Amino acid sequence: EGEEIILSAAEILQDGCFYRENYRSAVAEYHFISDGKKRHVRPHFTFYGFRYMKVEYVDKSGKPTEKPEGSVDNFTAHHLRSDFDQTGCIETGVKKVNQLFQNALWGQKDNFLDVPTDCPQRDERLGWTGDAQIFSETACYNMYVPAFYRKYLWDMRAEQSIIGGSVPHVVPRLKREFIEGHGSCAWADVAVVLPWNVYVHYGDKTLLEECYPGM
């Protein structure tokens, strides 16, 4: 009771060191103080993008302690994403090409959690419209995503209704410096490019009809 477990997320080990500067202001830590009872614990209202997870144990006085034997077995990582089926696959005789495709596929899985985000780990994790439209064609090849994109574009039109039809940089929009901006070329192209790419891949004009007034 009173002992603390600290989980810290990171993507890389730089020269053998636990490196998190690329996370910028994202703390990416989970602290749990035990009440002395055996519990199954998980984070709420957040998620982490990581390759490595550091586990630290702190006693009641705040001093680091040795980890219990076999403690790694007490942790399980769960992958979170929106539910869609994979429809595309590339396999060649070149391992590096195959790995490149897998990296792109997992990049999509990691960033498709309710909205198409720019990254799953640092202090953004936002639905940038520029990122969404430029990756949309690849996304349609990889996964069956018409419903996913329809929901995102519904959110976009809701934001447009608030800012006079302009397309925001980020959907859903946040009131933060630069992020709350709207009406820029490339980012605003999402209103045309994304519904068009969905139509080309799936042949359904419904999304075009829904989005046309906001184009």
Task: Identify the meaning behind each predicted range.
Residues 1-122, 130-131, 147-150, 162-179, ...:
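Extracellular/oxidizing-compartment recognition motifs
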Residues 125, 129-132, 184-192:
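Short alpha-helical patches at coil-to-helix transitions and adjacent helical residues
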Residues 212-215:
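C-terminal PAP-associated
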Residues 134-145, 190-207:
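Well-ordered alpha-helical scaffold segments within catalytic/enzyme domains
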Residues 138-162:
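Active-site diphosphate/adenylate-binding microenvironment
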Residues 43, 125, 139-142, 181:
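Short, charged/polar micro-motifs that form catalytic or ligand-binding hotspots
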